[in-house]
Each structure stands twice: as C-alpha cells, then as structure tokens.
Amino acid sequence: MAVSSLAGLGLRREMLAEFSQSVPAQIDFFEVAPENWMALGGKYGKQFRALTERHAFFCHGLSLSIGSSAPLDIDFIKGIKAFLDLHGIAVYSEHLSYCSGSGHLYDLMPMPFTPEAVRHIAGRVKQVEDIIERPLILENISFYAAPGAQMTELEFVLAVLEEADCQLLLDVNNIYVNSINHNYDAAAYLAAMPTERIRYLHVAGHYVEAPDLIVDTHGADIVDPVWQLLCDCYALHGPLPTLLERDFNIPPIGELLQEIDRIRDYQAAAIRTSRRAG
C-alpha cells in the first residue's frame, strides 16, 4: 500500500480573501475548475496567482466534453494548457461525460455505455494529452439514466481506463450515489477499481430526494455511509490524496476543516493498519 496521504479542498472565489492571509496547515492542496479562473484578473487574479505560487494545485475541468460527438475545441484545450503552465499545475482531470453539442454546456451528461463510446473517448484522450503535455485524468460521474447501455457502468469505466491507458479520479460519493440510484453493490465497485490507475479521490455531500434517489450536489456535509466507503477505499487502495468538494451552501472554513481533519484521521489510520500488516 502506497503512503501518499494528502488532503485538499476545492477553492471557491469567496474563500480567496481568507486564504490570502493564511492557509491552514491541514490543507495540502487546492483544486480549481480552470474555466472559472482562466480569465480572472484584477484583485482576485492577483490573489489567486499568489496562492498558486505558494501552494500545490490540481485542476478539475467542467467543459472539455471528452465524450461529445462534436470535434474537440482545440483553442479551448490550448487555453487550458496555458493556464496549467502559467500556474505550474501538473494534475488535470475531467469528467467521463459530455456536456456539449454545438456549444459548451455545464450539465454533465452520461455517456452511452457501449464499446463504440469506449473507443471514441480513448482516441480523444490521446488528442488532449498531446496538446496539454500531461496525463488526462478521468472521473467516474453520477448518472441518473443509461439509455442504450450495452455494458454496466463499471465495465464501461474499466474499459475506458484500459483502452485510453489513462488515470482515474475516483469519486467516492458518486459511487455511493449511483449504488443507491441503480441498486448496485458499492463495495464491489470499489474493489474492482485498478489501484495503479487511481490518481486521487473526491469526496462530497449529496441531497436525498427519496429513499431510492440521491442527487450529487456537493452542497451538504458528508454522510456516514460515504465516510465508511472512503475508509474502505483506503483499506483497498491506500490513503490516496483526497479532495473535499463543497460547491453550494458553503459553511465557514472552520467547518470544512473539520471534514478535512476527518479525512486526514482516516488516512493516518490506514497507514497505521498497513504498517502493522506489513
């Protein structure tokens, strides 16, 4: 089991002023959506640049649309590369989905789970990597319907990782959400993930619409079943770098730090267990 424990926080613009003064020691890295920061100037732009000069950053994109039938937006991808280069960011991930037809949309739509889609995505991953000169990391998304599926979501994700020879951003909350919405075994899904391809993890809260319908909102505290799944993930795959996502109903930083502390505690426990076993 690799010892690679880091805990991070998704940076939102309203946090800039506070973190410009100081960054709590519990936060090992930040994550941003480049689309929200690429054109930022003025005071916010200077504050952001000062942060990226002093702290580790990952990028998690919103609108690459890796699965779309439309051609890749080469100018957009070149802009992403320029942003990553400017801020010295090596880690760039995107959603295993599509969000565009004739233009960019921010609704992330699930891919059809088919061998044809696997081949389509794999080819586009190579195109993107050639431009950004970095690995393109893909994230398992939450989905609410799977029209035309010829394989399970698990089979689809594994096939894409293999065909594209790419890394995975494993979203633990999305596994839980999908397991409830589609009645599958979250533990079995987690165990099937290839450890060597997992680059880092996401964990977040969600909204329970009904007993059999959960919506992935990133707008609430993490619930106990997701915490347990995160612990199970560490036991199986090691205490991987883990990012706390909170996009809505953002509480005071102190409350977010409590969840980050919990991530760090679980990572430390996994390391202790591994050392005893070794």
UniProtKB/Swiss-Prot annotation:
Highest taxon of the lineage: Bacteria
InterPro entries: MbnB/TglH/ChrH, Xyl_isomerase-like_sf
SUPFAM superfamilies in alphabetical order: Xylose isomerase-like
Stated family: Belongs to the UPF0276 family.
Alphabetical list of NCBIfam families matching this protein: PRK05409.1 (NF003818)
Protein name: UPF0276 protein Sama_1305
